[in-house]
Amino acid sequence: MSGLLLLGLLFFPLVEIIKSVKEPEMLTEIKRRYEIIRTSLPADARWERICSKCAIITGMDPSSGVVGSNVNKGYEIYICLDGEDIDSAMYVFLHELAHMTVSEYDHSTNFWNNFKDLRIVCQNIGVYSPVGTKKYCGKEVKD
């Protein structure tokens, strides 16, 4: 059997396997809402990085012990995917997006103010509903 034919026989089943693997629905929904956020944020210097940069968004298993993380100010954002609580997941996602609005890497007063304002804007555009106080991926989230 020629090498090319063998490669073809291996390649096509692999393509079918890849096509059958689906992204978790919650991650798909977060990405859909992210695109709405990027195209709907008002003109404001704080939101410039969010609107101009398209982050790679990856889901994490709840057993990782991490609720969310942001690599290099939005190059990659990791979000814990736990159940079907989309608003708690969005709270965590907006927290990670808020890190893109400040130059510092810690949770400064400026960060918290921007995070609060971002949640309000996202509530107004219909991609976020306040969560109150609850557990998500083993951590407390609190609006």
Regions found by a protein language model. Name each.
Residues 1-88, 104-143:
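Metalloprotease/metallohydrolase-associated module, dominated by Zn2+-dependent proteases
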Residues 91-103:
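Active-site recognition of the HExxH zinc-binding catalytic motif
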